[in-house]
UniProtKB/Swiss-Prot annotation:
Induction: Expressed in the late phase of the viral replicative cycle. Keywords: Fusion of virus membrane with host cell membrane, Fusion of virus membrane with host membrane, Late protein, Lipoprotein, Membrane, Myristate, Signal-anchor, Transmembrane, Transmembrane helix, Viral envelope protein, Viral penetration into host cytoplasm, Virion, Virus entry into host cell. This is Entry-fusion complex protein OPG094. The lineage of its organism: Viruses, Varidnaviria, Bamfordvirae, Nucleocytoviricota, Pokkesviricetes. Component of the entry fusion complex (EFC), which consists of 11 proteins. During cell infection, this complex mediates entry of the virion core into the host cytoplasm by a two-step mechanism consisting of lipid mixing of the viral and cellular membranes and subsequent pore formation. It comes from Monkeypox virus.
């Protein structure tokens, strides 16, 4: 019997491991990647050592640290948004910020802590309490308040909390503005109520304006509350008083009652200049100004030159390709014959 043959193979060290993409991640270079993460979204941050874990937890308190694999592979899971109303609501461009020693910055710096703003924070009514107070102060931004009040009429939040916040805002605005509608935030509110253009918004406008003081009405609402003489004068004209009364044409439209605002929109205003050097009139005199727009001037009675009109239309029409049209006609006839 023959014996077996053994062969000794040369020994080799196994090839070095190739790191995966996750292993190459560096959490210290991922500030702008982690911050925008949505609620319950995972962000893989690569391997972490034990001492590094504590720093990451402190830097990102809105996230929970999760182990994803061997070698300390980890991920962050967003659980909350810790941004405050003053830091998130008084701008429409901020999604998050970094806080250190009581100061905030849009850029990360060593030792700073992330605080994120709730998505669509203005659309959910989470800013109503803060902005209602801030927009009455001395440091408010008119553009921010303008956009906030305008967006309140078009919110997509249909939750019970969102609806209640909107009702509370309307009630507070109504109480505030009924006392003095000249407050900037109230004038903005009236403007957006007018733009909303519903029966409810019109009723709220009139309710607020009718609650104003006598001094306010005398100063801002002389169109809506005219004198007896002005009312008697208006009986002489067929057109609405709002069309010729300077108190209406020069009024702040935010302080017009709905009926006056609507009448003002019906006016056809024609402006003309009249120069009079010397005019003497008595009780029997009569003066009428037409600005050169008599009935005979409005429509021309001169016959239209029809031949010239036809020539103009032919000249400016597209060039007819008669030979091309003939060829296309023959082609269509041939196709119809073949098809039959």
């Amino acid at each position: 019997m023959g014996g077996g043959v053994s062969v000794e193979l040369p020994k080799r060290d196994p090839p070095p491991g190739v790191p995966t993409d996750e292993m190459l991640l560096n959490v210290d270079k991922m500030h702008d990647v982690i911050a925008p993460a949505k609620l319950l979204e995972y962000v893989h941050i690569g391997p972490l050592t034990k001492d590094k874990e504590d720093k990451v937890k402190k830097r990102y308190p809105e996230f929970r640290l999760v182990n994803t694999g061997p070698g300390g592979l980890s991920a962050l899971l967003r659980q909350s948004y810790n941004g405050t109303a003053p830091n998130c609501c008084r701008t429409f461009n901020r999604t998050h910020y970094w806080k250190k020693d009581g100061k905030i910055s849009d850029k990360y710096e060593e030792g700073a802590v992330l605080e994120s703003c709730w998505p669509d924070v203005h659309d959910t009514g989470k800013c109503d309490v803060d902005l209602f107070d801030w927009c009455q102060g001395d440091t408010f931004d008119m553009n921010i308040c303008h956009q906030w009040i305008g967006s309140a009429f078009n919110r997509s939040d249909r939750t019970v909390e969102g609806r209640q916040s909107l009702i509370n805002l309307y009630n507070k605005m109504q109480r505030l503005c009924s006392k003095d509608a000249s407050v900037p935030i109230c004038e903005l509110f009236l403007h957006h109520l007018r733009a909303h253009n519903t029966e409810d918004s019109k009723e709220m406008i009139d309710y607020i304006l009718r609650q104003q003081s006598a001094d306010f009405k005398q100063k801002y609402m002389r169109c809506s509350y005219p004198t007896r003489d002005k009312l008697e004068e208006s009986l002489k004209y067929a057109e609405p008083r709002e069309c010729w009364d300077p108190e209406c044409s020069n009024a702040n439209v935010n302080f017009l009652l709905t009926r006056n605002y609507n009448n003002l929109g019906l006016c056809n205003i024609v402006r003309c200049n009249t120069s009079v050097n010397n005019l003497q009139m008595d009780k029997t005199s009569s003066l009428r100004l037409s600005c050169g727009l008599s009935n005979s001037d409005r429509f021309s009675t001169v016959p239209v030159n029809r031949a010239k009109v036809v020539q103009h239309n032919i000249k400016h029409s597209f060039d007819l390709k008669l030979h091309l049209i003939s060829l296309l006609s023959l082609l269509v006839i041939w196709i119809l014959i073949v098809a039959i």
